[in-house]
From Swiss-Prot:
<dbReference type="InterPro" id="IPR016117">
    <property type="entry name" value="ArgJ-like_dom_sf"/>
</dbReference>
<feature type="site" description="Cleavage; by autolysis">
    <location>
        <begin position="188"/>
        <end position="189"/>
    </location>
</feature>
<comment type="function">
    <text>Catalyzes the transfer of the acetyl group from N(2)-acetylornithine to glutamate, forming N-acetylglutamate and L-ornithine.</text>
</comment>
<feature type="binding site">
    <location>
        <position position="189"/>
    </location>
    <ligand>
        <name>substrate</name>
    </ligand>
</feature>
<keyword id="KW-0963">Cytoplasm</keyword>
<keyword id="KW-0055">Arginine biosynthesis</keyword>
<dbReference type="GO" id="GO:0005737">
    <property type="term" value="C:cytoplasm"/>
</dbReference>
<comment type="similarity">
    <text>Belongs to the ArgJ family.</text>
</comment>
<keyword id="KW-0808">Transferase</keyword>
<keyword id="KW-0068">Autocatalytic cleavage</keyword>
<protein>
    <recommendedName>
        <fullName>Glutamate N-acetyltransferase</fullName>
        <ecNumber>2.3.1.35</ecNumber>
    </recommendedName>
</protein>
<feature type="site" description="Involved in the stabilization of negative charge on the oxyanion by the formation of the oxyanion hole">
    <location>
        <position position="112"/>
    </location>
</feature>
<dbReference type="GO" id="GO:0006592">
    <property type="term" value="P:ornithine biosynthetic process"/>
</dbReference>
<feature type="site" description="Involved in the stabilization of negative charge on the oxyanion by the formation of the oxyanion hole">
    <location>
        <position position="113"/>
    </location>
</feature>
<feature type="active site" description="Nucleophile">
    <location>
        <position position="189"/>
    </location>
</feature>
<feature type="binding site">
    <location>
        <position position="267"/>
    </location>
    <ligand>
        <name>substrate</name>
    </ligand>
</feature>
<dbReference type="Pfam" id="PF01960">
    <property type="entry name" value="ArgJ"/>
</dbReference>
Length: 402
């Protein structure tokens, strides 16, 4: 899948030397800190017209291409909170700055949780102070950070890789993320913080991050709702070799791994699935078809019900806007242990009484399923990620205050 060797390692954001992290939680509220003083940075933010106050603040903070700290809280989104909400976001930055002897203009702020309620700022400031006293460069510190920013997540999400740049120098990327519900392009209800040691300017990091986000988080659909607080930030110590194509490929791999974790952790999820659209006429066609299939409520419910309903898959491809000949489409279902072609160049193979249908039904009982759709229209491909739509999803969101 990748043109170079990637070694997955432990450590999350702290896999990069010099990066400090910490996380504290008290009840439903948590605070995570990442310290990377004077780092080169770039970010991608939600495209929702309703934007949370920390998103607005961090856009300004990161505009000069450098940050020293990231503070993120869970339990309150600080969105639709007006001037008071912006004051609260600034107080978070100020508390970090005071605790760590830096300027508040160097502090990026992120929030996730309930929309439309004032931040319990005194509690958040207390948690910031507590986290600041626990900062260290360790696997445990990154893990505490990942846990502190969880909301409806059921497990913390971290990944780190080591790889060689084209010069032969070793480089690293580490990351944490949160996200399980309200996930749809563009981006997802998610926060992700990425660290690296590659030598790159802010504009170079921005370009690489946008490509990686587009090929990963923007191809992830849990429930089709787009958040007000989405944020992906990358910061670099610039202590390794120059940015190159190997770094860009590794960054895509890291973001895709986080996206897969989020798909597995969608609210109420019992199964996750990957949609690979191959042999499309254009890359955009491949992406449109993959997104449509991964986002289809009918496909999601078929996954939940272990129903190999190929009709829902081809219907979603058909309304996606991708150009292809329906009489040439092929569909394959795969699990870790077996694979079956259910539609072959427009011919239905999986119908009542066939071995193909029996195999397809077994595949659909797997916890992780791969759907391969061959459009037979070119040589472009794309991958999207999704999860099933369950009774528990409805229950969780019926009981959760927006």
């Amino acid at each position: 899948m990748y043109t170079m060797e990637l070694r997955f390692i432990r450590g999350g954001v702290c896999a990069v030397d010099g990066v400090l992290a910490a996380g504290c939680r008290e009840g439903k509220y948590g605070v995570g800190l990442i310290i990377n003083r004077g780092s080169t940075a770039a970010a991608v933010f939600t495209s929702n017209r309703v934007r949370a106050e920390p998103v607005k603040l961090t856009e300004r903070v990161i505009a000069d291409g450098s940050i020293s700290a990231i503070v993120a809280n869970s339990g309150n989104a600080n969105c639709f909170t007006g001037r008071e909400g912006m004051d609260d976001a600034r107080r978070m930055a100020r508390k970090v700055a005071e605790s760590l002897s830096m300027d508040e203009s160097e502090v990026a702020v992120a929030s996730t949780g309930v929309i439309g309620r004032r931040m319990p700022i005194d509690k958040i400031e207390f948690l910031i102070q507590s986290a600041a006293a626990q900062l260290e460069n360790s696997e445990a510190a990154s893990g505490a950070l990942a846990e502190a920013i969880m909301t409806t997540d059921t497990f913390p999400k971290e990944v780190a890789v080591e790889f060689e740049l084209e010069t032969g120098e070793k480089a690293r990327i580490g990351a944490v993320a949160k996200g399980s519900g309200m996930i749809a392009p563009n981006m997802a209800t998610m926060l992700s913080f990425i660290t690296t040691d590659v030598d790159a300017s802010s504009s170079e990091l921005t370009e690489a991050l946008r490509v990686a986000v587009d090929e990963s988080f923007n191809m992830l659909i849990v429930d089709g709702d787009e958040s007000t607080n989405d944020m992906v930030i990358i910061s670099s110590t610039r202590t390794s070799g120059r940015i190159d194509s190997n770094f860009r490929e590794a960054l895509v791999a890291v973001c895709r791994e986080l996206a897969r974790m989020m798909a597995r952790d969608g609210e109420g999820v019992t199964k996750s699935f990957q949609v690979d659209v191959v042999n499309a006429g254009t890359h955009e066609d491949a992406k449109m078809a993959a997104r449509a299939i991964a986002g289809s409520s009918l496909v999601k419910t078929a996954i939940f019900g272990a129903d190999p309903n190929w009709g829902r898959i081809v219907a979603a491809a058909g309304y996606s806007g991708a150009e292809f000949d329906p009489e040439e489409i092929s569909v394959t279902l795969e699990s870790d242990s077996e694979s079956v072609v259910i539609v072959d160049h427009g011919d239905i193979l999986a119908f009542e009484g066939t071995e193909e249908l029996e195999t397809a039904e077994r595949v659909m009982t797997s916890k992780e399923i791969r759907i391969i759709v061959d459009l037979a229209a070119g040589d472009e491909s794309a991958t999207a990620y999704g999860c099933d739509l369950t009774y528990d999803y409805v229950r969780i969101n019926a009981e959760y205050t927006t």
